[in-house]
Amino acid sequence: MQTAELPTPTENDTYTTAPLNHRRLAPEESLARSQAFLQTMRNRRSVRMFSPEPVPFALIENAVAAAGTAPSGANQQPWTFAVIGDPDIKARIREAAEAEERDFYAHHITPEWRAALAPLGTDFQKAHLTDAPYVVIVFTQAFGLETLSNGGERQWKHYYAVESVGIATGLFLAAVTHAGLVALTHTPSPMAFLAEILGRPRNERAFAVIPVGYPHAEATVPAHALDKKPLGRIMARY
């Protein structure tokens, strides 16, 4: 298979601009919006107990579209959001994830890590992967890849891909929370099985597994997870 590198942009490449579409808000409206958003996010929780109630797919689409507005290195947008609603595929993902997690908890977790996880009550069982109506797997495109008409490939470097995908994932979580849904960030290790199950291209690496839906009527969260650092411990003003 032939692989060609994209030419590196030079100073002769055309640089153009477009008007900024921005409406400045009155100070009162700005403050009201920021306070409302803060309250919404303060109520965000990582939820493992999902209702089987269907979620309108438009909510997922809007959340992914919002994530797609994230800034990225050289505006390369090196992410793919794989949305899985098929019960059979979700079952395969759960089976593989539980196998990896079972091995992790049995043979690889350190005493310090086990102690850190104890207040959260986590274990190898991942019912949320089949209970949630949708499971969204975020993939990082480690490098750009395009299949050519002659069967060859063209690939190119992606800059700050992991950092860019992390920002997009944060926007996705904020968007689903803003829409009244709950989610969980799950990172089984290793995660190569996810690309295999979904048949993703060879340039993609799983970044996070995010089940999304409505909370179960009897959902609970670890009390430990309610403890968030106060503003004074996370912000330094100069």
Kindly give the residue locations of the regions a language model identified:
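Glycine/small-residue-rich phosphate/adenosyl-binding loop
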Residues: 2, 83-165
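Glycine-rich, charged/polar anion/phosphate-binding loops
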Residues: 66-68, 119-124, 194-196, 219
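Short, basic and Ser/Thr-rich N-terminal targeting/leader segments
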Residues: 75-78, 130-132, 205
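A glycine-rich helix N-cap at a beta->alpha junction
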Residues: 101-110, 198-222
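C-terminal helix-cap and adjacent tail motif
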Residues: 2-30, 206-238
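N-terminal accessory segments that position/regulate proteins before the catalytic core
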Residues: 1-62, 103
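Small-aliphatic-rich amphipathic alpha-helix that forms the alpha element of a beta-alpha
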Residues: 63-67, 136, 142, 146, ...
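Glycine-rich phosphate/pyrophosphate-binding beta-alpha loops
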Residues: 68-75
